[in-house]
Amino acid sequence: MNEVKCVFETKLSPGDVAKLNKIVGAVVPVARCTPLISPRDVGLHKHVSHRTDYGKLHMALNMMYPTVFRKLEGNQMVMTPMQHGNIYTIRNTGPFSWEVGDRLAIIPPVFSVEHTTIMQTPSWDLMLPIIVPVQVAKEINIRNLVLTLMSLNRPGRDVELSQEVRRIHFRDVTIDIPATLDTRQLNSVRNVCLALALITNVAPSLLQQYVPRLALAETDMLLVKCYDLLKKLDLPGDGNGGEPPNIPNEIQRMSGLLNLITYVSSIVTENSLFIVNDITPDNKMATCTFTL
């Protein structure tokens, strides 16, 4: 399928036409990737509450299909679904500049819902996500987790510290992410804490068992330092009590530990959707390879 068309039920006003023509090249998420869709399937509007729930928007965005808005044709938006490995010219709708070689991720609007709301009607708003370098997306996810965790044991009036955690500076831009608290974010914090507790419980015995062997086999200074640190820890036993290792049990423990580490990483890591190949002088448009 080469095109997805969003058909408007009523004639667009000249003002709306002008607004849409200004965002040609924008990445527009759609709920259904079919030849004809309605406005309610386009953008993030139906997932936005008065509290601008970032967790809810993030989850919804991950379930949608990214398209590129190509043109306005009569009373309909014409969009192109993206395919892995293809090259697209996309618009920078976020606050941060891009550079050639950047890997870009798509995230919900985090600095101003109004800024990413392109047009408004009585029944529907066109709200777009923002495209940022993956390191920015990762930092935003980390800060959201930190803010949520801090909110559990700090008073709401602790503004100064909150603002410090909320502020993100990248290249020549500084933004403040919203300090909202929602149940999905709390679930993420709870699950991360559980995973870290299990990692803390399982990792020491595995490290105590295998790092000394690696230190004997290798002369790498990092391994030697790890061995020295482990000798200072007050750990019970010697890893397996002198008994031959139970292979199935060892595999289960190692697999479980690595899965937990992978889970913690997945909470904050964003998938790279684009690699920037070329950028216009004003940094508003870029030619990118779609990598998802």
Curated annotation (Swiss-Prot):
Keywords tagged on the record: Capsid protein, Host nucleus, Virion
An MF annotation (GO) of this entry: structural molecule activity
One Pfam family hit: Herpes_V23
InterPro entries: Herpes_capsid_2 (IPR002690)
Subcellular location: Virion; Host nucleus
Gene Ontology CC annotations of this record: host cell nucleus; viral capsid
Oligomeric and partner information: Interacts with TRX1 and major capisd protein/MCP.
Function: Structural component of the T=16 icosahedral capsid. The capsid is composed of pentamers and hexamers of major capsid protein/MCP, which are linked together by heterotrimers called triplexes. These triplexes are formed by a single molecule of triplex protein 1/TRX1 and two copies of triplex protein 2/TRX2. Additionally, TRX1 is required for efficient transport of TRX2 to the nucleus, which is the site of capsid assembly.
The protein, known as: Triplex capsid protein 2
Source species: Elephantid herpesvirus 1 (isolate Asian elephant/Berlin/Kiba/1998)
